[in-house]
Amino acid sequence: MSNKRRYFGTDGVRGKVGQYPITPDFVLKLGWAAGRVLAKQGTKKVIIGKDTRISGYMLESALEAGLAAAGLKATFTGPMPTPAVAYLTQTFRAEAGIVISASHNPYYDNGIKFFSSEGTKLPDDIELAIEAELDKDIECVESSELGKATRLNDAAGRYIEFCKSTFPSTLSLSNLKIVVDCAHGATYHIAPNVFKELGADVIAMGVEPNGININEEVGATDVRALQKRVVEEQAHLGLAFDGDGDRIIMVDHLGNKVDGDQIAYIIARDALRRGELKGGVVGTLMTNLGMENGLKQLGIPFVRAAVGDRYVMEQLLAKGWKIGAENSGHVILLDKVTTGDAIVAALQVLASVVGSDMSLHDLSQGMTLYPQVLENVRFAGENNPLEAQAVLAAVEEVEAELGDKGRVLLRKSGTEPLIRVMVEGEDAELVQSSALKIADAVKASC
């Protein structure tokens, strides 16, 4: 069996709807191939959730048909955050959980990602086994062994109660006014209720999904509307979730953005204060230097993983640590959940706000973010612009200018045809001009 993946990226199979591999025929075969592999594992039962994209209906049907042909039973949750599917997969002792979502991407993209029976990303050997089955012709099981589909009507209620259970029972949100932006995505019917039931005065936005407005100028990838609303409503803070509920970005009462690095810092510092910090914190190559320095001042160990929550998780498991994060808002808290869970992460920050009687603004001041600029350059073709001489020369020149007061990172996106250029350092103007210089070199080499 080849170790090279053809379909699975860093976060499952993803692409533009209607273009290979996100087509009804491929997804049907993917369901069958996954069903063949999973059927050998045990219960022959899977949980299927999705976000609010219009294409979810089509892909859900195709996926279930493939699974049924392989003899697996599917339980549909309807629109449900990705971490909720991971949780429900565990509680129902299902063989796997499947999420139909493209997370923070626009509505015209979609994807399929899998969770193991433990609520974690599928092991590499299972993904490779599924890819091997995709090379075979579909063979339907005997009619008496075909799978069937059922619907889980109380999925949202179950997950809401789980989220609330991660918030200290001695605390309440009754003195907080919170603006909650659900990105017209999978948390729209869940997140506002979690915070309301814990006592908060909730102002909800991004809770009117129509199939094509997911992540559109709302949510964790675009917090401008939330920043404006928090200030207008004189709220204590704002919470922005992405389309599938695994990313969280916060906004303080002054309208300042609080990103994944700052959120992880607040959670780690609070755990240290309570004597409950188990080990250190895992970030990524994109984690701001300010977080690394802030943790160092507290005596908290820190390591960087490759970009992607899969790699953060690998480092956490290898070290036995419990807190990992990406600045984009993926926050993994292994003492509470098995994957990145935006609602649960938000609740831990709110527990710190209430427990310390400090504002989100004040809590986030413990670390100073370095100016950081990210430029995305779209590319196509077989050539690798990262190896182009002009790009290497531009990087070398910028690194010499920054010295030990900044850093440069170039990488290919794991989910889109993009080269990501990141520059950070103490001097904001130098950082901006340096990022543009490298991005121009990448564009010229594409």
Curated annotation (Swiss-Prot):
Origin species: Vibrio parahaemolyticus serotype O3:K6 (strain RIMD 2210633)
Residues forming the catalytic site: 103
Record EC number: 5.4.2.10
Cited NCBIfam families: glmM (TIGR01455), PRK10887.1 (NF008139)
GO molecular function: magnesium ion binding; phosphoglucosamine mutase activity; phosphomannomutase activity
Catalytic activity: alpha-D-glucosamine 1-phosphate = D-glucosamine 6-phosphate
Post-translational modification: Activated by phosphorylation.
Entry protein name: Phosphoglucosamine mutase
